[in-house]
Structure formats: C-alpha cells, structure tokens
C-alpha cells in the first residue's frame, strides 16, 4: 500500500546575526574564555620545575599557546569542522550520526568513537565547573590572605547554588550572559595591553621558532609542558558543539574578531609581566591588576566562570538527551524549563550526579593547580575522536579522495594525539579522574546497548507476526468496542505485547487499532513533512510511524494531530494508548555476565516511564505489565 505523509506549519524562529554573535560570546566561549585564569601560570610552573623562570620558558610557553589556539581551535574547529554540520547541528554525537549517514549504515567503529567522545565530554563537564570556579575564588588569597581557608567552602557553596538553580532553567538570566562575557573579554584585553608595555619584546613569541626551540631544549619537560599548555585550548570543542544554537558565521565572527584577540593579548600581557616581575608567576592573572581592583576582578571572574560552568552543564544535559534519543542510554526524566525554547531542559538525575562529581573533585584536589593535572585528558580524547570522525565525513560525505581527506585532517589529529600523549603523563597526578568518569559512562552505554539487543532477540522468539494475527481475527472476530486503541511498539511487523494481553484478558478489539512506532532519525531534527507516515493494512488496523530527530522532544499527541491530514480523525478523548511495561528478572543462564545482567536490569528499572517521556496524557493510558527473564 502507498505510504503518505503530512507537513506541519511550524517554522523555526529567526534571530539577528549580531544577536546570535553576542549570545555566542556569552555561551560558546565561556570555557575557553576563563582559561587565562590558570593556563599560562600552570604551563610556566611545569616548565620551570621549581627553578627560576627564564626568558626561553616564557617565550616558549607563549608561542605554544599561540600556535595551539591557531591550529587546534581556529583552523581545525572554527574553519574546518564548523562546516561539517548535521542539518545545522554540531557536536560529537552529531558528527557520529553524520558519519554513519555518509557511509549509509551503522558503523561499530564510528559508534565507538562517538561513545568515547561523548563519555569524555561528561568527564570534562565535571572538571570544568570545579577548576573554573575554584580558580576564580582563589583570587581571595591575594586580596586577603586571611581568607585562604574560605576558598574551598565558598567554591562549594557557589557550585551547590549553581546546580540547585538548574531546575528553574536559565531562560530568564541567559540574556545577561552575553553582556557579562563581553565585559570579561574586554577586561582581559585591557589588562593584557597595559602589561605588554612592561616588556614589548614578548611579542617575539609570535615566531613559532620559540615553541620549537623550547621543545628541543627541554626534552621530556617540554612534553609535560604541552599537557599544561593544552589548558589554553580546552573548551575549543564547545565551539563545534554549540553550532546548532548560534550558527557557523556568528561563532566564527565572535572568535576571530573578538575572543581570540582578547585571549592572545591577555596571555602576552601575562608573559610580559613575568619577564619584568618574575615574582608575579605565583598567580600571574590576578597580579596584573592593582590591589584596589582585585575584588571587582574576582567578582567578574567568578561570574564568568559560573557562566562557563552553566554552558558546560547545559551541554551535558543536551548530550545525555541526544544519547537517550539515539538509544545509547535508558530514558532519563526530562523536564522542560522554558515554554518557548525547546532546548531548555533539566535532567534531575544527571544534575545530581554531576554535582556529586564536581564536589568530589573540589574536595579531593582543593586548589586549581591540583585540578589542572586532571584537566585536559578528557578534552584531548574528544578532540582525537572528532578528528577521526571528521575524516570519514570529508571522505564519504564531501566526496574527497581518501588521500586528500587524510592530508587535510590528519595533521590536526597528529597534534591532538601529541596533546593526548602529554596529558597521559599526568595520569597518576589526577588525569585518572576524568578517565574514570568517562570509562564509567562508556560502560553504562555499552551495557545498555548490549542488554537491549539481547532483550530484543529474546522477546522476538515468542512474538507473533502482525499479519498472521489480523488474518486470524478476520476468521474469528472478537467482540468489537468503539473507539481507537494505539499500541506502542518498537517493531511494527510483530504484534505488540499490550495488544495480545488485551485480546487474551479483555477479549475485545477496538474498531480502530493503530500500531504506533517511534523512530529516531540520524539527523538532529526531522522535517515536519516527514514526521508522520501512515499505512492502512486492514479495515481495523493501520500502522503509524512517527520520526523525531535526536535533538527533538518526542511529543506523541502533538505529532498525531498531523495524521488528520492523512484521513485519520484523531480525537485524543476517544483514544486509548496501550503501553507495555517489562519487568526484568535475571535468568539462571543469561547471555550476559552476571554484573552486566544486574546493571542492565538496574538501568531498565531507572528508566523514565514511556507515558511521561512521550508526553502522553496519563488519563488516556492503559499500562500492561509483563515479566521477562534475561
């Protein structure tokens, strides 16, 4: 039979270019924009090894920072990967989906890269709030040394308030993020310009030879220093992840003409300060201003780090939501904090887990220098994964020859690999923490995927083909009742469990029965014209398929209204939704190792109710329970 579809009249809102650029400055660059608080200081400390800071060290570190920002952030992300958008969206999972779409099938290799990159992003989303807020509050030690003991408690208090605030969303205060960060970056530039005059010869670091000379003359210390230099580019991957929110041009404009110059000027100002006043290396950032300006700068830095942390938290919510839609994780409870912005979501469980992880990091390391050792490994792993997946997109989707695609992307991957190796050297000093968080996340995804596949295989053995049931009901029709019954199922070729139970226990059949399947596309959003597909298979049965993008919130009743254009007189008040709820029990002989079996069952039990997740009115739902051993 012919398949039909209908379109919706909904249209995405449009925002002015400069408004998007301002918004991007407030959200996209928060993480990388707060790196001057600690990046240069930590790199110089590592390079000096406790000895006197020399001119070679300062110029070498500055040159490494400059060219890292040029190569990794500007060339790789801003100029190249921002063009690899998946229907306007960016980020690790979007790149994974784009690569799979490009090769025309699901790839275990690409899936693994996407999972690794996403898992490491979650690890990074715990470290960023901790190190950012802690480094800002540490300015109190300079303003008032007697307050040093209050740095950690104050940091904990700020973070608890920040995470507690998530339940109300950020829509009301987000408009202030842009102006605050404009002030922040402008302040960075002014501070840098003032101190470059202390020793203008610091500008010689623009010559990449100083980076090469430093590496050649410092051996293994140089490689360890690269791990600290990487702190200056952490957050670069966020430029790509936020592509869908602000667009390529606004992000490129904000970076190239405002954020990058401000960062470089500040770093060079810190370098000039250390060359003229070596004692300032203790905390180069806060030593750039006189004591009378310390408190206002601490307040501004704290505001900037809170905004940066907010962007990372929001990114974590978005990534987990995408992972759920792609079937990588169970359905977590999602609350919508804005009636006008679909992307404003709050995941209570994820928020609590992030808060616990962040507080553990603050209490474990207690200062930003300690956390700096843990920072970087997660981001560098994500960047390597992005680079390899980018090669697939350039080759398969853009149509480049493999050699040309490799020549373009693998120099960036090589640089990312060097940063990754350098960060591995900090494994025992703290880099194990984000790796542990990432490993735990990847394990959850792996077990959920494996358990779900095994559950499908097990239930398939007892399922009845839908066409066989329809033929049987036509020969021996049961009692027919008025109304419409919608049966949710993952496979429309087989009879939903709820339908079998309805026939077995109630011995009735509705006059209209809809076998409803909800699919997630490999695109962030689905064109409304392709949202609903309907197929009539008999007088009493029809199949309806709803397609949602992996960044969309599946709203079943709203989508079914579109079916009216296909001839189905859908009325929510005369429709009953039948949902099957599985109760999983461990089998005596499971196909999974014992620990995986119990973990999968625990994940399944923690999943949000399908009724709530698909936004179906609870008063119209009939839930049928079944017990399955796995």
UniProtKB/Swiss-Prot annotation:
Q: Where is the signal peptide?
A: none
The subcellular localization recorded is:
Cell inner membrane
GO MF terms listed in the record are: potassium ion transmembrane transporter activity; symporter activity
UniProt entry keywords in alphabetical sequence: Cell inner membrane, Cell membrane, Ion transport, Membrane, Potassium, Potassium transport, Symport, Transmembrane, Transmembrane helix, Transport
UniProt membrane topology term = Multi-pass membrane protein
Q: Which reaction does it catalyse?
A: K(+)(in) + H(+)(in) = K(+)(out) + H(+)(out)
Q: Where are the transmembrane segments?
A: 17-37, 56-76, 108-128, 145-165, 176-196, 214-234, 255-275, 293-313, 345-365, 375-395, 402-422, 427-447
Please give the HAMAP family that the UniProt record associates with this protein: Kup
- State the protein's purpose: Transport of potassium into the cell. Likely operates as a K(+):H(+) symporter.
What name does UniProt use for this protein? Probable potassium transport system protein Kup 2
Organism in which the protein naturally occurs: Rhodopseudomonas palustris (strain BisB18)
What lineage does the source organism belong to?
Bacteria, Pseudomonadati, Pseudomonadota, Alphaproteobacteria, Hyphomicrobiales
């Amino acid at each position: 039979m012919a398949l039909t579809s209908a379109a919706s009249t909904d249209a995405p809102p449009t925002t002015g270019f400069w408004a998007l650029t301002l918004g991007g400055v407030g959200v996209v660059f928060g993480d990388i924009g707060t790196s001057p608080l600690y990046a240069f200081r930590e790199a110089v400390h590592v390079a000096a090894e406790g000895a006197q800071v020399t001119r070679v060290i300062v110029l070498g570190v500055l040159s490494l920072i400059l060219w890292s920002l040029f190569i990794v952030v500007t060339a790789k992300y801003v100029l190249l990967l921002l063009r690899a958008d998946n229907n306007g969206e960016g980020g690790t999972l979007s790149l994974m989906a784009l690569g799979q779409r490009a090769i025309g099938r699901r790839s275990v290799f690409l899936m693994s890269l996407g999972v690794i990159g996403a898992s490491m992003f979650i690890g990074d989303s715990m470290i960023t709030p901790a190190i950012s807020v802690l480094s800002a509050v540490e300015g109190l030690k300079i303003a008032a040394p007697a307050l040093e003991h209050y740095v950690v408690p104050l940091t904990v208090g700020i973070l608890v308030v920040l995470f507690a605030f998530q339940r109300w969303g950020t829509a009301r205060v987000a408009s202030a993020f842009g102006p605050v960060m404009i002030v922040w970056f402008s302040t960075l530039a002014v501070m840098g310009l003032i101190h470059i005059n202390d020793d203008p010869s610091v500008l010689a670091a623009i010559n990449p030879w100083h980076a090469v000379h430093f590496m050649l003359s410092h051996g293994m210390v140089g490689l360890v220093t690269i791990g600290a230099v990487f702190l200056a580019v952490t957050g670069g991957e966020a430029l790509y992840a936020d592509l869908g929110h602000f667009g390529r041009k606004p992000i490129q404009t904000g970076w190239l003409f405002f954020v990058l110059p401000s960062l470089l000027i500040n770093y060079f100002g810190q370098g000039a300060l250390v060359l003229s006043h070596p004692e300032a290396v203790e905390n180069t950032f806060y030593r750039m201003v006189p004591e009378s300006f310390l408190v206002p700068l601490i307040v501004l830095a704290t505001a900037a780090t809170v905004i940066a942390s907010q962007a990372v938290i929001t990114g974590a919510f978005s990534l987990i939501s995408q992972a759920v839609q792609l079937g990588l994780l169970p359905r977590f409870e999602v609350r919508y904090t804005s009636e006008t912005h679909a992307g404003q979501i709050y995941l209570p469980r994820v928020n609590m887990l992030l808060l616990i992880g962040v507080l553990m990091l603050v209490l474990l390391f207690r200062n930003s220098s300690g956390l700096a050792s843990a920072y970087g490994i997660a981001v560098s792993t994500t960047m390597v994964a992005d680079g390899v997946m980018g090669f697939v997109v350039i080759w398969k989707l853009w149509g480049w020859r493999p050699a040309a695609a490799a020549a373009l992307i693998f120099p960036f991957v090589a640089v990312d690999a060097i940063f990754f190796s350098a960060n591995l050297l900090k494994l025992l000093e703290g880099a194990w923490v984000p790796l542990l968080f990432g490993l735990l996340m990847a394990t959850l995804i792996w077990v959920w995927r494996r358990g779900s596949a095994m559950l499908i295989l097990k239930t398939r053995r007892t399922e009845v083909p839908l066409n066989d049931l329809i033929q049987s009901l036509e020969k021996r029709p049961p009692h027919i009742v008025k109304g419409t019954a919608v049966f949710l199922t993952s496979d429309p070729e087989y009879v939903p469990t709820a339908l079998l139970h309805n026939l077995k226990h109630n011995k009735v059949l509705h006059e209209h029965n809809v076998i409803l399947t909800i699919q997630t596309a490999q695109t962030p959003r689905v064109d409304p014209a392709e949202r609903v597909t309907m197929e009539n298979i008999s007088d009493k049965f029809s199949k309806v398929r709803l397609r949602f993008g992996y960044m969309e919130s599946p709203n079943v009743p709203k989508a079914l209204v579109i079916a009216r254009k296909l001839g189905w007189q859908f009325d929510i008040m005369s429709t009953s939704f039948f949902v099957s709820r599985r109760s999983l029990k461990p089998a005596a002989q499971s196909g999974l190792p014992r620990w995986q079996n119990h973990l999968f069952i625990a994940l399944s039990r923690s999943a949000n109710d399908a009724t709530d997740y698909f936004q179906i009115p609870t008063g119209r739902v009939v839930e049928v329970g079944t017990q399955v051993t796995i």
